[in-house]
From Swiss-Prot:
Intracellular or extracellular location(s): Cytoplasm
Record's protein name: Polyamine aminopropyltransferase
Catalyzed reactions: S-adenosyl 3-(methylsulfanyl)propylamine + putrescine = S-methyl-5'-thioadenosine + spermidine + H(+)
Entry binding sites for S-methyl-5'-thioadenosine: Q32, E107, D139, G140
InterPro entries: PABS, PABS_CS, SAM-dependent_MTases_sf, Spermi_synthase, Spermidine_synt_N, Spermidine_synt_N_sf
Main location: cytoplasm
Stated family: Belongs to the spermidine/spermine synthase family.
Top-rank lineage group of the source organism: Bacteria
Presence of keyword Transferase: yes
GO biological process, one term: spermidine biosynthetic process
Keyword terms of this UniProt record: Cytoplasm, Polyamine biosynthesis, Spermidine biosynthesis, Transferase
EC number, UniProt record: 2.5.1.16
Gene Ontology molecular function, alphabetical: spermidine synthase activity
Length: 283
């Protein structure tokens, strides 16, 4: 759009995280304001409604942590649902697995996909063309409601922070519907916000999943572009989770293509729950 550089900031409770660079794209879609900026250090970055979503520099911290703990523990052919994920990073990580039979990506805002393909094509690349992928421009909540019981083996909730059009993706009723459409041994994997910047939302997510599913586990790591830098991902199942019992040969293969995730990283990340979160969950 222009060669003039400017600061773009995300504000949160009296703090801010900003990037300085050239604005490559700016538009208000039916659902949200979309900005793409190019920064010297983080590369191209995507902001939705004033919140940083991803950047080329640190997106693998997020996408690898969301996908691989779940998919590396699945042994059989699987149907996968991605709710959100319009930047393509979750799709890219999913298509690394030959055992995935089908991927449904449900994104409410088609503009996010279009813009990501044009300005952030380094994220997903050819993954957009994988024959197993079907893209649906739809409301994720409504998609889940109309899906038959036990249909998906893995569900990824790759959504933005709570907002007017995404609040229901964090609700107890929505997680309950996800449990209904999962296969008996299926896994729900969701980004579960920051235990620091979004502590109350984080606690509510963990409590809901603990109440609905037989077992849930949360891992913590870093996404530098997000408020406070620390983030979380939670994995839940109606049967015993086997997140530490991966197929060794497959893990070795997947690790070679990852920048952040490996089994040692994962095992440590599942042991990083801050004690203040432990206390609130036990109260």
């Amino acid at each position: 759009m222009t060669d003039i550089t400017t600061w773009i900031d995300e504000y949160h409770k009296g703090s801010r995280f900003g990037l300085n660079g050239k604005i490559l794209f700016k538009k208000t879609s039916k659902y949200q304001e979309i900005i793409v900026i190019e920064n010297e250090y983080y590369g191209k970055a995507l902001m939705l409604d004033g919140c940083w979503m991803t950047s080329l520099k640190d997106e693998k911290y997020y996408h690898e942590c969301l996908v691989h703990p779940a998919l590396s523990s699945i042994d059989e052919k699987s149907n996968v649902l991605i709710i959100g994920g319009g930047d393509g990073g979750t799709v890219r990580e999913c298509v690394k697995y030959s055992k995935i039979s089908k991927i449904d990506l449900v994104e409410i805002d088609e503009e996010v996909i279009k813009i990501s393909k044009k300005f952030l094509k380094e994220i997903a690349g050819e993954a957009w063309n994988d024959k197993r992928l079907e893209i649906h421009i739809d409301d994720g909540v409504k998609w889940v409601e109309k899906t038959k019981d036990n249909f998906y083996d893995v569900i990824f909730i790759d959504c933005s922070d709570p907002s007017e059009f995404s609040n229901l993706l964090f609700s107890h009723s929505f997680y309950k519907e996800c449990e209904r459409i999962l296969a008996p041994s299926g896994i729900l994997a969701t980004q579960s916000e920051s235990p620091e910047s979004f502590k109350n939302i984080h606690i509510n997510i963990l409590k809901s999943l603990k109440n609905i599913f037989k077992v849930s586990e949360t891992m913590y790591s870093f996404v530098p572009i997000y408020p406070s830098g620390i983030w979380s991902w939670t994995f839940a199942s109606s049967e015993d989770l086997s997140l530490s019992k991966q197929n060794y040969d497959e893990v070795v293969k997947i690790e070679k293509g990852c920048e952040i995730w490996n089994l040692n990283f994962q095992n440590a990340a599942f042991k990083m729950m801050p004690n203040k979160i432990v206390k609130e969950l036990d109260s």
